[in-house]
Amino acid sequence: MDIGVCVASHINDIDYVVRAEELGYSHAWMADSQMLWSDCYATLALVADKTSRINIGTGVAVSGTRPAPVNAAGIATINALAPGRTFFGVGSGNTARRVMGLPPQRIAEFEQYLQTLVPLLAGNEAELRYDDKSIPIKHIMPDKGFVNLSDPIPLYVSGFGPKSLGLAGKYGDGAVLGITDPQAISGARHMLNEGARSVEKDLESPSNFYTTALTTMVVLDDGEAIDSDRVKAECGAMAMAAVHYSYDQFRNFGHQPPNALSGIWEDYTNLLESYPADRRHQRIHAGHNCWVVEEEEKFLTPEVLNASSMIGTRDQIIERLSDLTDAGLDQVMILPNFDTRFDVLERVAADIIQNV
């Protein structure tokens, strides 16, 4: 099992990835959300310059904010700086679009995007859809050092439901998941396989398809409660980001929240609905995956914390990682609270990476 880090892209926080490389983390995924963080490609360029071994890429770039040729050129530029260790993660825009009051791309649009993107990443000609036209495009100076399209850039497609997971299996070299339950991983593998079979791909070999799950980890001290102040300080932001996502699903589609949120749901929705409707999309993601805003701290119940993060003793987490490996997961990437990120980085490296 590989352990990677997902990073809220911060142009002045490159040392965090440098330290992750020193500690043996396998991948650094730079998050892409233009109304929250620094630009992911600018951050990746600095990361590429300061590191030499860790795999680096977008975690994940957003199809609905940058046209496929722009994203392809961006990651191919990073590949020129870090050949052989650059990857490209892409999704339809859960937070990056919703924070602007827009929905993620629809599945049909996302598939069309991937159809353009895949050949571009390989240095080939692609078809760009514009209005009702299909236009052939390609990078016309790929051999002059501007980009690197010679060294492969693995494509990892983010998927949550059956259709997006099917697209990941069909077009991707791997998938980015938001689940860390072994049974759910097995179910996701089935959906990935369905997509792969539609184009006669074989996902059975790990070398053919690489799966990653986003979460964070807290290694408990002896006798420590799952909702201790330290636990909240290390994974509370991840927990609330999951609540933000559930609220968006409820708000946009009428989906009911998971059972873990039942104890807070009424109070949480009342809080958000006290904000003006025309700017509520700005408030939903306050502190997103970095901090917990003060008025949301009361929602960090044991159930909410445990639903989105891997919290347990060293042995419990190692056993869970073993179960996830058996279910077909290749990597867990962690995204801890911003203020405690170095503490988590060191603890997970010492207690987990050294033992898996």
Predicted regions and their residues:
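N-terminal beta1-alpha1-beta2 module of alpha/beta enzyme domains
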Residues: 1-59, 153
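Conserved, mostly hydrophobic/aromatic
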Residues: 24, 47, 78, 117, ...
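Active-site mouth loops of central-metabolism enzymes
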Residues: 1-11, 61-69, 149-160, 217-220, ...
